[in-house]
């Protein structure tokens, strides 16, 4: 019940990291890593522009002119090659339609807030504390997860795999409220079980699935009061809102929706839900599930790249013993002679017991 796009992005990032080690100091490692991730998004979704923005928004964490060219080239080349070998239409090229009147903005905004709650619940399950009995061997956990998925799949096969067909079906036409609610709860729980029980996979595709279910449920309930509401638009907006909270990339999510649907109006409508969802999700949970996973490993990416680099460096790696050793018994003249012969301007006064007493500059001695 996990996705394939997360591992695809990781694979692209690993390739970028490999090339950064080959090139050493010729380019910034994070730019090549971001280029690999952008290429993965571009080829996986058929979305080269979204790949570019995703790399800047989620990985680089700022828009850099230095990084635009290599990331864009990687994204476009990956898209060109993938479409050459695998010709495919946009994943959700359906007749959805955009906002038809001003009053539809309010349901989209409310849907964004609801999606933030669902996304936060999903992310809490993925990253929060999960008490697993220590008696269960680690290698046995994936077997348990696989068994649970197998049993559930006998009754609801829609919950297994990427669920692309189910997503398309629910965007096109509504189904019973109970059925959609079961799919929403089932997908959320199954994905959490799979990830927490060490089954390898991504959380992006399940977020799309959960988001569509959220939007569909909200749209069906809203249609009781507003029969003319655009059901498909709300379903897609829910998908975008939940996904943007999970990956922490609102702009790239809107662009992914645009490139998946080939409909600018749909992207605009979904953008309203995305904005409200991220405002609330950032307050009640945080930036994204990925950030929290790093926080669980005591890596706070909000400190900035420089501070993270310093935190990862050991003093032993940069410690230098190349200094001029002076003793308190030296006279000023002796110190000047020692520093002059060593062609150095400063020395360190060390006691016989090896204690640092201070530093002295040659200009202070003259």
Q: Which residues does each predicted region cover?
A:
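Alpha-helical transmembrane segments and immediately membrane-proximal extracytoplasmic
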Residues: 1-312, 317, 321-357
